């Protein structure tokens, strides 16, 4: 059931993945899949009668690049957890939605936007995507698919690992 109880999830199989290899294996053996995380969508985009893959345990922060201010995470990382981790490094992502309980993969795939008027996905520089056959495709800013992948609703594949370019943290001031 979704957070607001308007979407009920019915499925044939449910898998809770914790590694990229598990994600690849489930996708490779499944005919139709839907990915879900914290069930924050009011739409039924993640519901269906096929295989559901829960990515909420696929939630590790994998690496930091202190020189380039980049962080790489698994797609099930919760936005609030990512923000807390990069804030400790003095970094931020300057485009944030008003909700921080969503998964990074879900936020990107659905075009989440925020405070700066930009899309969160504009700060994604690289990612790996699991394709329908279970193979892995690495995509970076030089790849012609990068913009399509950024807001793909899962049509092109399932985002696995995602790298964000962060900025130095700053303070907002309100003038009235």
Question: What spans do the regions from the language model cover?
Answer:
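Hydrophobic alpha-helical segments, principally membrane-spanning helices and signal/leader peptides
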Residues: 4, 90-91, 139, 146
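Glycine-rich N-terminal segment of FAD-binding domains in flavoprotein oxidoreductases
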Residues: 5-98, 111-116
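Residue-level marker of motif borders
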Residues: 14, 33-34, 71, 101, ...
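Secondary-structure junction/capping motif
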Residues: 78, 103-104, 119
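Extended alpha-helical targeting/anchoring segments
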Residues: 100-103, 109
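FAD-binding subdomain of flavoenzyme oxidoreductases
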Residues: 107-176
């Amino acid at each position: 059931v979704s957070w607001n109880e308007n979407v009920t999830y019915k499925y044939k199989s449910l898998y809770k993945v914790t590694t990229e290899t598990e994600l690849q294996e489930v996708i490779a053996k499944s005919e139709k899949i839907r990915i879900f995380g914290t069930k924050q969508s009011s739409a039924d985009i993640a519901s269906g009668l096929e295989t559901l893959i829960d990515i909420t345990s696929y939630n590790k922060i994998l690496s930091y690049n202190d020189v380039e201010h980049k962080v790489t995470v698994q797609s099930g990382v919760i936005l609030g957890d990512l923000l807390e981790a990069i804030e400790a490094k003095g970094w931020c992502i300057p485009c944030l939605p008003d909700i921080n309980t969503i998964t990074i993969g879900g936020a990107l795939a659905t075009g989440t936007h925020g405070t700066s008027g930009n899309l969160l996905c504009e700060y994604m520089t690289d990612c790996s995507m699991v394709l329908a056959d279970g193979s892995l495709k690495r995509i970076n800013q030089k790849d012609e698919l990068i913009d399509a992948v950024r807001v793909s609703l899962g049509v092109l594949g399932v985002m696995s690992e995602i790298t964000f370019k962060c900025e130095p943290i700053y303070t907002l001031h309100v003038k009235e």
